[in-house]
Regions:
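Sec-dependent signal peptide cleavage junction
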Residues: 23-34
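N-terminal edge beta-strand
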Residues: 106-136
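Non-cytosolic beta-sheet module surface loops
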Residues: 121, 141-143, 177, 191
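Beta-strand-rich interaction surfaces with strong enrichment in secreted/lumenal proteins
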Residues: 126-129, 159-165, 173-174
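Histidine- and aromatic-enriched segments that form or immediately flank copper-ligand environments
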Residues: 144-167, 194
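Exposed beta-strand and adjacent loop surfaces of beta-rich binding modules
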Residues: 114, 136, 148-150, 182
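Membrane interfacial helix-start segments of signal peptides and signal-anchor transmembrane helices
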Residues: 1-20
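Extracellular/periplasmic metallocenter environments
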Residues: 21, 35-36, 41-110, 166-204
Length: 204
């Protein structure tokens, strides 16, 4: 009787040990990242990528998907060009190496974790937002009046991250946030900055 009880205890302990090993192995493989206010994991990429070397094969790029239709594709949380190289945030907007903005989109189709800005004669709203260094950011701009608005960052490091919208139009762009710091942005339409169309992106 005691032998049977001892065998059951040993078998139970062995099963428990196997379960613990499996759980620990799974936790070790999971790459946990920061979590947004909505509870979704924030997607982070290294900020020191070699932007001249492809990080994907042509086949992998074909399989990659954009966060929203019309923006550049994303592979392993890195925004990439059609040739598989990480995009450059410091080139001319709209160039092949730059992150691409969408055509006009329905704002209701934007991902829930997008940074959604509106632009009007009253300025940008919100005029300040925070992201993490390397974070995959989808930034949208909606004109809520009958004017054109062009969001540009002052820092040349982000010269390619630009969104231009027509009256009552929404467009978006996806990019990886730069290193930590404060990055002012403004509306580049003549006269709009002087009336207060400006803001700041804070990268932590």
């Amino acid at each position: 009787m005691n032998n049977k009880k001892n065998l059951l205890i040993i078998a139970g302990l062995a099963i428990l040990a196997i379960i613990v090993i499996i759980i620990v192995a799974n936790l070790g493989n999971r790459q946990a990242g920061p979590v947004s206010q909505s509870g979704e994991e924030i997607r982070i990429a290294p900020t020191d990528l070699d932007r001249e070397t492809p990080i994907a094969t042509p086949e992998e790029v074909m399989q990659a998907k954009p966060v929203i239709e019309g923006t550049s594709k994303v592979l392993d949380n890195v925004v990439v060009t059609p040739t598989g190289k990480p995009v450059k945030n410091d080139v001319r907007p709209g160039s092949p190496e730059a992150p691409q903005q969408t055509a006009p989109v329905n704002p209701e189709t934007l991902p829930s974790d997008s940074v959604k800005l509106t632009g009007s004669a009253a300025g940008f709203s919100p005029d300040r937002f925070e992201v993490k260094a390397g974070q995959l950011v989808t930034l949208s701009l909606t004109s809520v009046d009958d004017m054109t608005h062009v969001l540009l960052f002052a820092d040349p490091e982000l010269s390619a991250v630009a969104i231009g919208v027509g009256p009552n139009e929404t467009r978006a762009i996806t990019f990886n946030a730069p290193k930590a710091g404060e990055y002012p942005f403004h509306c580049d339409v003549p006269g709009h900055l002087s009336r207060g169309e400006k803001g700041v992106m804070v990268v932590n």
